[in-house]
């Protein structure tokens, strides 16, 4: 391949600009990122070589080398891992293959501090080299390819890069950073070693640097042995030494690992700048033996709701890396969890297909799921914010609390923070994980009609139900305001009955799998006829029956006028101030869920709701004798639709009818 000049993907160009201008406060993370990439490349070679040992060529010992040259102003990170072909260099270094990239770029504000945090949350990997370099040269050869098929990639971090074929005998990749003048302090063995010890000490591969020793300066006067000397300095000996412990952190005893080391390992595997919210480290022995080190992030990634995204758990077998995104190790609703699972029982050549079928993997999955749920239960118990926690469940994860913290204060508010970030995806578990459905239900939190500030669990709600109340009432809506001001809540507010307000897109789908909590049924206030049971007195019931009989002719006329829109029309006792509202049958799909499915491009049935009218409202009383009956009937229906967050099927016709009545 002759030298080519190619353009970066648009998102990469913007990211590079921000990397060079926003991450000034924590420059040294570039070394962590590049060493992590080098380690991953060696892990991938080790995995591919399971089926083809020839890929090791004449260098079976995998390692990462860090070297510097003050005269040339370069810092080089090399590995003898899998390497890259020319096309792979173009694909991997010229584009960002991560999902959510455009979403990421759209959220960048230009505020350096805010963008720095956002970039850290996204993870910049290789591009972090431009924090300290004004040019990067990458030389690589893929394992198994000829020496003549090496590749050189060069970029100054602007809008384009050069790529050409070179002769390269060594397998693997060298990333050569051409340092900026203000980054020359990274040409210091002491500084580089301190950064490696801080961020990459746990890398299981040896990280090598050239050994240095002190050398006195030359005599100013060679004939005077006792005279003065030129300044001495450290000089390279030509030997290489290992500068990291090279011990996988999860294989060490918990007592030998500091919280800071746990945090740095999390940052290395997740490429997150923020510390994790909580973690759990455990070795499981028995019929299936494995070690798990699992983390809860502090912030949700931008692609959290992409169910096809890569999982966050790395799989090792006897400390040999197998795969990055082992989705079989945790259910999809826990896709936000990061960490490592190291199995002693799986074969080294395990495939994704085998993972789906393996009994050992099933046991690991169940164990990891219980461990994560136990961690969440522990956080919920110790959450001292005003939001009460669901209590009464059994924490089957022994020892989690001592992993998290000995002090309740250390966990104060953590569950509330977790739930604000990940609560919506946790609800997916109701439909995916039947075995843990009850545990998940205790972890859910919702807004309430009784308070503007406190999130409420099902257990909290049940503990303060009114005497004679037979159900947990809830409403689903597009927004908190739409839920709180919904006409369907009017009678509940009048009687002081609490209603849970559910506004996550997943809520209605999830509650299809949860019909009751601790023996108490869940009842949507927007489905079926309102039945308050013992909370409705006999006088109210009698008045409702009489109104239904009195209004029979009017209801028949309304039903005829709205036959294309409404399944039925009936008198209701649920309304106090509003003239009408829409509900669906007990087991029908709500209009909100139908709208959501259609917006997502999925097939959804046309829902014909039931129109319920308030017999005491002046507008309803006026209907029967009005010459504008037909227009008023349609306006009544469309206003009820608007009140629940929907839109009239024909907005222009609605406006025309309203205007006609106004003049």
Curated annotation (Swiss-Prot):
InterPro entries: HATPase_C_sf, Heat_shock_protein_90_CS, HSP90_C, Hsp90_fam, Hsp90_N, Ribosomal_Su5_D2-typ_SF. It comes from Albidiferax ferrireducens (strain ATCC BAA-621 / DSM 15236 / T118) (Rhodoferax ferrireducens). Pfam families: HATPase_c_3, HSP90. This is Chaperone protein HtpG. It is found in: Cytoplasm. Keywords: ATP-binding, Chaperone, Cytoplasm, Nucleotide-binding, Stress response. HAMAP family: HSP90. One of its GO terms (molecular function) is ATP-dependent protein folding chaperone. Belongs to the heat shock protein 90 family. The gene is htpG. Molecular chaperone. Has ATPase activity.
């Amino acid at each position: 391949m002759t030298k080519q000049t190619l353009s970066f993907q648009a998102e990469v160009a913007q990211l590079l600009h921000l990397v060079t201008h926003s991450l000034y406060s924590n420059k040294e993370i570039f070394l962590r990122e590049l060493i992590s990439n080098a380690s991953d490349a060696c892990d991938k070679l080790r995995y591919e070589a399971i089926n083809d040992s020839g890929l090791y060529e004449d260098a079976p010992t995998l390692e990462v080398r860090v070297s510097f040259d003050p005269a040339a102003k370069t810092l080089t990170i090399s590995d003898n891992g899998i390497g890259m072909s020319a096309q792979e260099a173009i694909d991997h270094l010229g584009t960002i293959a991560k999902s959510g990239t455009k979403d990421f770029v759209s959220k960048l504000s230009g505020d350096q501090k805010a963008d720095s945090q956002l970039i850290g949350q996204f993870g910049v990997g290789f591009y972090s080299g431009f924090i300290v370099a004004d040019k990067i040269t990458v030389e690589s050869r893929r394992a198994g390819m000829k020496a003549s098929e090496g590749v050189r990639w060069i970029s100054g971090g602007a809008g384009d890069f050069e790529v050409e074929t070179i002769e390269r005998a060594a397998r693997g990749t060298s990333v050569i950073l051409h340092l900026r003048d203000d980054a020359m302090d990274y040409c210091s063995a002491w500084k580089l070693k301190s950064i490696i010890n801080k961020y990459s000490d746990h890398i299981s591969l040896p990280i090598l640097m050239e050994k240095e020793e002190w050398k006195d300066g030359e005599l100013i006067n060679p004939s005077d042995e006792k005279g003065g000397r030129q300044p001495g300095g450290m000089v390279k000996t030509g030997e290489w030494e290992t500068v990291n412990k090279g011990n996988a952190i999860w294989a060490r005893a918990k007592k030998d690992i500091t919280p800071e080391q746990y945090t740095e390992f999390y940052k290395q595997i997740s490429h997150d700048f923020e510390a994790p919210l909580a973690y759990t480290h455990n070795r499981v022995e028995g019929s299936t033996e494995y070690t798990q080190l699992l983390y809860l992030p502090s912030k949700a990634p931008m692609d959290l709701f992409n169910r096809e995204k890569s999982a966050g758990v790395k799989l090792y077998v006897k400390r040999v890396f197998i795969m990055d995104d082992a989705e079989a190790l945790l259910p999809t609703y826990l896709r936000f969890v990061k960490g490592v699972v190291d199995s002693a029982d799986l074969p080294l050549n395990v495939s994704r297909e085998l993972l789906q079928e393996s009994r050992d993997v099933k046991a690991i999955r169940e164990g990891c799921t219980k461990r994560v749920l136990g961690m969440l239960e522990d956080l919920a118990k110790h959450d001292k914010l005003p939001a009460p926690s669901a209590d009464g469940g059994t924490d089957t994860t022994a020892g989690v609390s001592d992993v998290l913290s000995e002090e309740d204060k250390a966990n104060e508010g953590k569950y509330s923070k977790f739930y604000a970030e990940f609560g919506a995806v946790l609800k997916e578990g109701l439909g995916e994980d039947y075995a843990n459905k009850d545990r998940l239900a205790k972890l859910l939190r919702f807004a309430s009609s009784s308070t503007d500030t406190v999130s409420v669990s099902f257990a909290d709600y049940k503990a303060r139900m009114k005497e004679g109340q037979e159900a947990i009432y809830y409403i689903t809506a597009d927004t908190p305001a739409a839920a709180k001001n919904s006409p369907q809540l009017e009678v509940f507010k009048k009687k002081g009955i609490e209603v849970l307000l559910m506004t996550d897109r997943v809520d209605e789908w999830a509650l299809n799998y949860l019909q009751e909590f601790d023996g108490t049924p869940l009842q949507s206030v927007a489905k079926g006829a309102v039945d308050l049971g013992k909370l409705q007195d006999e006088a109210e019931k009698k008045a409702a029956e009489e109104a239904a009989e009195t209004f029979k002719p009017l209801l028949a006329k309304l039903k005829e006028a709205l036959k294309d829109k409404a399944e039925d029309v009936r008198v209701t006792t649920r309304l106090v101030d509003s003239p009408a509202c829409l509900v669906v049958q007990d087991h029908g799909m709500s209009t909100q869920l139908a709208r959501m499915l259609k917006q997502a491009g999925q097939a959804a049935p046309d829902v014909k709701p039931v129109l319920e009218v308030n017999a005491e409202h002046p507008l309803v009383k006026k209907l029967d004798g009005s010459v504008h009956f037909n227009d008023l009937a349609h306006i009544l229906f469309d206003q009820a639709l608007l009140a629940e967050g929907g839109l009239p099927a024909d907005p222009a016709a609605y406006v025309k009818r309203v205007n006609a009545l106004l003049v």
